[in-house]
Amino acid sequence: VQELNVAGAEIARKAADCCERTIIVAGSIGPTGEIIEPLGELTKAEATSAFNDQAIALKEGGVDVAWIESMYSEEEIECAITASKEAGLPILLSSTFDSHGKSMMGHEPKQLVELAERYSPEIIGYGANCGIGASELIGSILCLAKSRNNQAMHLVAKANCGIPEYTDGEIIYNGTAEIMASYACYARKLGATIIGGCCGTKQEHIKAMADALEANDMDCPIELDEIIKSLGEMTKGNMLMIEKYLNLGNSSKVSPVNPRRKRRR
């Protein structure tokens, strides 16, 4: 764990330091794959110790921030938070939400917001990552944006590049650069200040997203029908969750949360 995390962080740090502008390097801390007791056999002490080993190694390798991501259990998230705090790293936190707009353990977006804001200022931002495509993740961002109280904290969007498909012995994500560019603009319109791509995202997708964010003002209210047409269908479960959080009723418009922020070069 120590050797791999130090090496990975050092590679990222070296690449970032070659850029002309300041680049923040985040070290990813993902789930253990086990369930915390009493539902599972992993103790909180064991989980915290494992996360602490990783967080210390990431810091040694040169990361600026710990990114706790893809987690679905509040208990495991809290263990990772404790470990990252002990390592002296500021924290970003993102969860993965399913087709019903909840985590695997049944937690809603507002519960992630409550957890993250409780640990502020150590946690500097929170949001959603991975999931089942850009459209569904935007649904989660809608709910998170509606739930937030501390506007100073970053809102994070990190969608998969489409849906994985098994083709000719390979896992291929079906998202296009155009879809990811549109997703990035919708995410910013809803208040996201940290926007990226998760599984399947390649260099050409990141470039398309960056170019779109630089060029697109997106000043008009967002139409849900427009999001679906641009990014793909949302599940019924996610639509119901959005209606619950935003009280849309018969309206399909979502007003902007934040003014546009110019991307720094």
Where in this protein do the model-derived segments appear?
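Domain-level signal for soluble alpha/beta catalytic cores
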Residues: 1-265
